[in-house]
Amino acid sequence: MNRTKLVLGAVILASTMLAGCSSNAKIDQLSSDVQTLNAKVDQLSNDVNAVRADVQAAKDDAARANQRLDNQAQAYKK
């Protein structure tokens, strides 16, 4: 009887410890995945900001070109 309780207690203790280890491994993996995703989000944010600046420069160039065309069209109408 005592031996059965001892073996049962050892099995429960071992399974609890193994479950704890696997949970820690999963938590570590998830933490690593989150860090990787955060790095990718930061990179994408930087890329969006760079593209945003390029788009604004293209808009400014287009506005200047349109203004020059408007000025030329007005010169021909006179």
Curated annotation (Swiss-Prot):
Lipidation (N-palmitoyl cysteine): 21
Gene Ontology, cellular component aspect: cell outer membrane; extracellular region
Pfam families assigned: LPP
GO molecular function: lipid binding; peptidoglycan binding
Lipid-attached positions, S-diacylglycerol cysteine: 21
Compartment(s): Cell outer membrane; Secreted, Cell wall
InterPro entries: Lipoprotein_leucine-zipper_dom (IPR006817), MOM_Lpp (IPR016367)
Chain coiled-coil ranges: 27-75
PROSITE patterns: PROKAR_LIPOPROTEIN
Sequence repeat locations: 24-34, 38-48
Keywords: Cell outer membrane, Cell wall, Coiled coil, Lipoprotein, Membrane, Palmitate, Peptidoglycan-anchor, Repeat, Secreted, Signal
Secretion signal, residue range per the UniProt entry: 1-20
UniProt modified residues of type N6-murein peptidoglycan lysine: 78
NCBIfam families per the UniProt record, alphabetical: Ala_zip_lipo, PRK15396.1
PANTHER family referenced in this protein's UniProt entry, alphabetically: MAJOR OUTER MEMBRANE LIPOPROTEIN LPP, MAJOR OUTER MEMBRANE PROLIPOPROTEIN LPP
Subunit details: Homotrimer.
Protein name per UniProt: Major outer membrane lipoprotein Lpp
Native source organism of the sequence: Yersinia pestis
Taxonomic lineage of the native organism: Bacteria, Pseudomonadati, Pseudomonadota, Gammaproteobacteria, Enterobacterales
